[in-house]
Amino acid sequence: YTAPGDGDNVKLSRLGGSDWAKTRKKVKAATEQMAKELIELYARRKQAHGYAFPADDTWQGDFEQRFAYEETPDQLTCAADIKHDMEEPWPMDRLLCGDVGVGKTEVALRAAFKCVMCGKQCAILAPTTILAWQHFNTALTRMESFPIRIGLLSRYRTAKEQKETLRGLKDGTVDIVVGTHRLLSGDVKFKDLG
C-alpha cells in the first residue's frame, strides 16, 4: 500500500533478501515500541482518578424528555453507557461514532448536560466550522430552558466574541463551549473542565 504522492519514495525489496529483513526488523521494533507505549498509557489511565459524576437527577430526566424525537434503541444504549462511564471514578475512554443523522449529537448533548449540571464545564470539539456552528445552535435550542451558558469558538466569531468566550471559560461563566480545533489552542483555559 502507498499513500497518494508516495510513488517516488517506494522501494521494492526481494522477499527473503537482506533489505526486506532489515525493513521487517525495523517495523517490528517500531510496532513493539508503540504497543509498549499504549500499554503504559492505559495502565496510567487505569490508575488515574477522575471525577465521578452523580447518578441522573430530575433535571437530567426533564432535559431528556424534552427531546422532540423518539430515540432509537442504539441512542438510548449509547447515552446510558456514556453516563454510566461518567459515574465511574476514572477517566472515560469511549468513542461515539455513527453515520450522519443517527443521533450522535443528542447523545453528546445528554452527556454535556449531565456534566454542566454537576458544576463542571464541557467542551464539544467538531471537525469543521460548519458542524461546530450547527452543534452550537442545536445546544442553544436544546438547553434554552435551563441555566446553561454556551459559547462558540470558531472563525464565525469576532475577536471580541472569542475574547468574551475565553474569559468565560477561565472564570467559569461559560458552561459549554463548542468549537473546532481552536479549542486546542494554548489560550483556551478552563476553570473546571469535566
Describe every region a protein language model picked out.
Residues 1-74:
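Upstream accessory/linker segments immediately N-terminal to the RecA-like ATPase cores of bacterial MutS
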Residues 68-92, 106-107:
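N-terminal pre-P-loop "Q-motif" helix
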Residues 75, 100, 128, 178:
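Conserved hydrophobic/aromatic pocket- or pore-lining residues that grip, position, or stack substrates
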Residues 87-98, 106, 119-121, 174:
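Pre-Walker A (Motif I) flank of P-loop NTPase domains
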Residues 93, 107-136, 144-149:
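Conserved SF1/SF2 helicase motif Ia
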Residues 103:
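Conserved glycine(s) of the Walker
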Residues 133-145, 161-168:
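Short amphipathic alpha-helical segment within the helicase RecA-like ATPase core
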Residues 153-177, 184-193:
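Conserved motor-coupling elements within RecA-like helicase/translocase cores
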